[in-house]
Regions:
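N-terminal Rossmann-like NAD(P)+-binding subdomain of aldehyde/semialdehyde dehydrogenases
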Residues: 39, 43-162
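Aldehyde/semialdehyde dehydrogenase
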Residues: 48, 78-97, 236-260, 297
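Single conserved hydrophobic/aromatic residue that forms the stacking wall/gate
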Residues: 289-297
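Rossmann-like NAD(P) dinucleotide-binding subdomain of oxidoreductase/dehydrogenase enzymes
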Residues: 153-287
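Adenylate-forming
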Residues: 88, 288-289
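Short, positively charged and aromatic/hydrophobic N-terminal segments
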Residues: 14, 21-23, 30-36, 40-41
């Protein structure tokens, strides 16, 4: 599929206060659009795979080592030591600082990995969106932790019974992050996990090595391996990662791979959250290459 993806890019065009997202052929990274008789926009290709290395530079990590790291993460929850509000907010604040203080470094790493993706678009769509979500979670985590009242059923309601739901963390959440938004889809789920009081183990994409290495370095500098573990490894490591007995597993990627992930997770009865690729809506206008759209959209 990479061959067809390389021929296309997403362009965000703003005209008359309206934003159009157009999927269009890529030629020399630049395309001229005649949006009206008075408007000519030279748009730079901002999404693509021109610089993506489809061969991993990472070695595989033995399954026993992955399992040992998971055991360390799980031990805290086995001991019943659940993170409270103060600790959750501290973790979230660290993530906010990581993204905010290193936004330029993230942009440069993503640009280096992708080649054709404009750095400002990466900052907006991948980095700043992560920061916005982390700030939102930091502000709201206290209210999310509050117990919720429920009405007890008959006959307990006649006996003065009261019912409440107290939300508890799963324990250790596994996160499999794809290549297309390597910051948002790795740190974003980590924000979720931390806000809910979980620890996490993240498998980063081997296809964006500079960004993945930066994420790993920053996480290691700010968190202990009893809070979060970042894994960079080749294909077999990704396969072994899905075989680990997590308390919950988050996967973002293709439907075909998701079937394999689901199959492995089912062997350990691991609940899943899947965000899967699918249809990509396209706006076709009069000057669009319709035959190309029919083939690739």
């Amino acid at each position: 599929h990479l061959g067809s993806i390389r021929q296309y890019c997403f362009l965000f065009l703003t005209l008359q206060r309206r934003t159009y997202i157009i999927n269009t052929p890529l030629k020399d990274n630049k395309i001229v659009y005649f949006l009206s008789n008075k408007h000519i926009i030279l748009a730079e290709a901002i999404m693509g795979l021109g610089g993506i290395n489809t061969e991993s530079i990472y070695a595989d990590i033995p399954f026993e080592e992955l399992s040992s790291k998971l055991d360390i993460l799980k031990q805290r929850y086995i001991d019943g030591n659940i993170p409270g509000l103060a600790e959750r907010k501290e973790r979230l604040k660290k993530l906010i600082d990581i993204v905010e203080d290193n936004s330029d470094a993230f942009g440069e790493a993503i640009q280096s990995d992708f080649g054709t993706r404009h750095q400002q678009i990466s900052l907006l769509a991948d980095v700043r969106s992560t920061l916005s979500f982390a700030n939102y979670s930091y502000k709201n985590v206290s209210s999310w932790m509050q117990p919720e009242k429920r009405s007890p059923n008959f006959p307990l309601n006649l006996l003065g019974a009261k019912a409440r739901v107290h939300y508890q963390p799963y324990g250790v959440v596994g996160i499999i992050s794809p290549w297309n938004f390597p910051v948002n889809l790795s740190i974003g789920p980590l924000v979720d996990a931390f806000a809910a009081g979980n620890a996490a183990m993240i498998k980063l994409s081997e296809f964006v090595p500079r960004t993945s290495q930066l994420v790993e370095n920053l996480i290691k500098e700010n968190f202990s391996e009893s809070e979060v573990v970042v894994i960079n490894g080749a294909m077999q490591t990704s396969i072994d990662f899905t075989k680990l007995p997590f308390d919950h597993l988050i996967y973002t990627g293709s439907t075909d791979i998701a079937k394999k992930v689901s199959s492995e997770a089912a062997k350990n009865l691991v609940p899943l959250t899947l965000e899967l690729g699918g249809k990509s809506p396209t706006i076709a206008v009069s000057y669009t290459h319709l035959r190309a759209h029919e083939t690739h959209s």
